[in-house]
Amino acid sequence: MTAIASIWAREILDSRGNPTVEVEVTLDSGYIGRAAVPSGASTGTREALELRDGDKQRYNGKGVLKVVEAVNGPISEAVIGIDALRQVQVDNTLIDLDGTDNKSKLGANAILGVSLATARAAAEAVGLPLYQYIGGTNAKVLPVPLMNVINGGAHAPNNLDIQEFMIMPVGAETFRDALRMGAEIFHTLKTILSADGHVTSVGDEGGFAPHLKSHDEAFQYLVKAIEEAGYNPGSEVMLAIDVAASEFYKDKRYFLTEYKTPLNSEEMIEWLKGFTSRYPLISIEDGLAENDWDGWRELTVELGNDIQLVGDDIFVTNPIMLSQGVEEGIGNSILIKVNQIGTLTETLDTIELAKQSAYTTIVSHRSGETEDSFIADLAVGINAGQIKTGSLSRSDRLAKYNQLLRIEEELEDSAIYYGPVFSESNHSCCDHT
């Protein structure tokens, strides 16, 4: 009754108005699972390959009709008849059918859509919420949201090199309260920016994208917004950034707009250390470029005992890359993006390796998103403790937050908000008040 009976893909649009693929998996019992695939703007070079049509006469070459054809043709033929409860078998069939290291034959967007839709259909068939299907009865930790309220870099047309400035409402007792705190700070920040004459248009992920004098000014605005919203920076609300340093790394140098000459790795580390000394900054993602492994090692030596150092582009949700990073002392945390690796099984393998290696895990969206809220269930399913899914505007971001509200409500008294745990384990880093 849980065998896959049919698979159907269609081309839909993501939050940037670009095509992406949506897949429906129907079981012989009639249960249906649907999943839409996200897309990134700043991508790691080792990510599984997202295929596009390349036809400039249609969607400026970004169509995904070839991906749709792959799903409705060879992928469908290979997977129909497999029991949807056998997620590993489904995913391995997809991996073998593609036959490449980076899923470049069929496309990670084709494979991922089928993988996630299968999990959803299976959860429906056995009558479990998706997070519980993924993680069992132990799935009950609601994640701390890393809310991207100021956008820069590849996510916004302004002069900030750092791609994301985020707030983390660790002082809340529940996820519902954390979301409220974030929303209050977000709206306070808007009022402050507007009063100072800044445009309050938003970037890809729903955060503001002002032209500021410096990165320090961005941090200062965040601290001011937290305080004026009635919260304590450092104890109730911590800060996080995604530097996305690979975006401005060239010839082993970092080209920052606020410096006339590029920085080497050591200078870049000192630049980042300055922020940690001046502000309640607890988490730095992609502080150095994905190919600057020597620099990453030094960064980890300098800051790894004090704050969270998150690898995104350097690890790309790949267990092989993470294993190498663990061996070489690179970072202490990994960002989890399902479309970087391409199947749910490989994603879960990477998460398991991270936990065995005492690395923290942050489940993440992409800048090109849809209303699909799979990652909210994934974050609870694996007890990740942290989720990064944008700001407090744009319904493609809020879809994930709203799903987490539903999950917390469903779990009732067994729900555990991770904020106090995170705060306790990092209490010594952020005393700047």
Swiss-Prot record:
Pathway: Carbohydrate degradation; glycolysis; pyruvate from D-glyceraldehyde 3-phosphate: step 4/5
Protein name in the entry: Enolase
Keyword Secreted among record annotations: yes
Catalytic residues (positions): E205, K337
Gene behind the chain: eno
Function, in words: Catalyzes the reversible conversion of 2-phosphoglycerate (2-PG) into phosphoenolpyruvate (PEP). It is essential for the degradation of carbohydrates via glycolysis.
Keyword terms of this UniProt record: Cytoplasm, Glycolysis, Lyase, Magnesium, Metal-binding, Secreted
Catalytic activity: (2R)-2-phosphoglycerate = phosphoenolpyruvate + H2O
Binding sites annotated in the UniProt record for (2R)-2-phosphoglycerate: Q163, K337, R366, S367, K388
Cofactor: binding comment: Binds a second Mg(2+) ion via substrate during catalysis.
Cofactor(s), by name: Mg(2+)
Gene3D superfamilies: Enolase-like C-terminal domain, Enolase-like, N-terminal domain
Family: Belongs to the enolase family.
One Gene Ontology molecular-function label: phosphopyruvate hydratase activity
Recorded superkingdom: Bacteria
EC number(s) recorded for this UniProt protein: 4.2.1.11
Gene Ontology CC entries for this record: cell surface; extracellular region; phosphopyruvate hydratase complex
UniProt-listed Pfam families: Enolase_C, Enolase_N
GO BP term, example: glycolytic process
PROSITE patterns for this protein: ENOLASE
